Regions:
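Charged, terminal alpha-helix-loop-beta segments
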Residues: 1-159
């Protein structure tokens, strides 16, 4: 994830505008569909039915690291492998979640479409109820604001 987008996500997660819950960044979605090596990635997911917990990648994360591991070429496992393994358990069945996309600068209408597509892929993988979709950016756009309003996506501006 590019640095600007990562900083934007972190600012949102740490703000009062974000939901409370367990956060994951760069969540692979579509793992249950087609080629196992082909998947999309949603910027962030907050499991709102869980106690508040920062993303595993954050240095001040104090929970269980379920899926994030430093890259280790000898082991050959990546984050998608971690999520695949986690899907095989019932640890996170029936969760309520918020799906988040972030785009630095002015968001594009395409980012809204990507967010909706990522939601459908996530729902195919997990037995989760998506409570809300959020598009985070640092610049307003009248077109994106209109599309978000029409499609029930919350547009959040983070400075």
């Amino acid at each position: 994830m590019p640095g600007d987008r990562r900083a934007l996500l972190e600012a949102f997660i740490r703000s009062d505008a974000s939901p409370d819950g367990k956060w994951w960044l760069d969540v692979p979605v579509g793992l249950s569909i087609g080629d196992p090596d082909t998947y999309a990635t949603v910027d962030a997911v907050c499991l709102t039915s869980r106690d508040p917990e920062l993303p595993e990648e954050f240095p001040d994360h104090d929970g269980v690291p379920y899926v994030y591991r430093e890259v280790d070429p000898e082991i050959g496992l990546d984050k998608a492998d971690g999520f695949r393994a986690l899907r095989g358990t019932d640890t996170f069945d029936g969760e309520s979640v918020v799906v988040v996309a972030a785009e630095s600068g002015a968001s594009s209408v395409g980012a809204v479409g990507d967010l909706l597509a990522h939601q459908k892929l996530l729902e195919a993988d997990w037995d989760w109820t998506v409570e809300e979709r959020v598009l985070v950016s640092d610049t307003d756009s009248d077109h994106v604001t209109h599309v978000c309003r029409e499609l029930s996506v919350r547009a959040v501006r983070v400075a």
